[in-house]
Structures are given as structure tokens and as C-alpha cells.
Amino acid sequence: SLVFSPEIDELSKPNKIVSLYDPCCGTGGMLTVGKNWIKENISKDVEVNMFGQELNPQTYSICKSDFLITNEQPENIKLGSTLSKDGYQDTNRKFDYMICNPPYGVSWKKDEKYVKNESKEPDGRFSVGIPRTSDGQLLFLQHMISKMEPSGSRIGCLLYTSDAADDWSS
């Protein structure tokens, strides 16, 4: 709700169409929850087009199947590593809203060559810096920033930090 609440007036406009993107969508659960929250709490008339990308072939298949069953647009879900092969790069697609829960502590070593090369490009997704290869959460955040509409977008990203596991969080 933090992503959408400040936009209630904008989302309540007649014939409103918005895009919702998750770069590590898994089975599509966060996308579905986001769309349902907008429909139930803001306006059932908003058209929410969902987009996502998933690395794991099994969870990708579940997401595509769910989209088929629920009459969504399964072609909007891409297979592959968001970090090394942006599924929306060819169209330079931007999104109104982006949500994700990137994998914590997952190595991006397989994508290292591509990520490092792109980090050297002034307009590259990762040009502000790259984290250690043992945890790529911040790469997903940088990726989403690159997908923002020129007029602005809203991002909700659940990042895990080691502080969350320390005594401070008790």
C-alpha cells in the first residue's frame, strides 16, 4: 500500500491505465497482490497491466500459467536473468509502479561479466556502483530505477539487511 497510497487521486481518474512491474517475479504473487490492492482499495476501474521477469524456469512457468488462467497477459512475463538480459531492453519499456522482493544472499557471479561491462557505461543500469558478488539485491534496485518513467514512477523494494537478523530487530 505504501507504493500506491500517495497516488490515490491519480489512480482514481477515469479510464486510468497503469503498468506494474516485478523484475524477479517468481510465481507472480506480488504482482497479483499489487493489482488486487489497487482494485480493492482505490478503484476497480483502473486497468493494471502486469509485467515481470523470472530466472527460474519452474516459477516462470507457474507465473505464466497463472496469467493464462486469470486472463492476464502471459506474454508480459519474461524468462531469464534480469541482471544480464533485461527482458524489456529491446523496447526500452518504462513502468509506472515497480515492486520486488529481490533474492537475498544470492550470488550474481554468473552475471558478473555483463554487469561489470554495463557498469562502465555512463547510462548503464549499474553505473552508480556494484555490490559484492555474493548479494545482488542492490542491482535489482538499480535496474528498477532505470525503468522509471521520465515523469516519475514509484518503487517498493523489500531489501533484507543483516541488521534485520541482529538483536536490534528483536
Task: Give a label for each model feature.
Residues 104-139, 154-162:
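Mobile active-site "lid"/loop adjacent to the S-adenosyl-L-methionine
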Residues 148-150:
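Helix-to-beta-strand junctions that scaffold the AdoMet/dcAdoMet cofactor pocket
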Residues 23, 53, 78-80, 100-107, ...:
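Generic beta-strand/beta-sheet core signal
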Residues 88-97:
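A short acidic, Gly/Pro-enriched loop at the edge of an enzyme's catalytic core
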Residues 64-89:
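S-adenosyl-L-methionine
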Residues 1-42, 48, 53, 59, ...:
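Class I S-adenosyl-L-methionine
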Residues 160-170:
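Single conserved hydrophobic/aromatic residue that forms the stacking wall/gate
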Residues 143:
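Short, conserved SAM-binding segment of the class I
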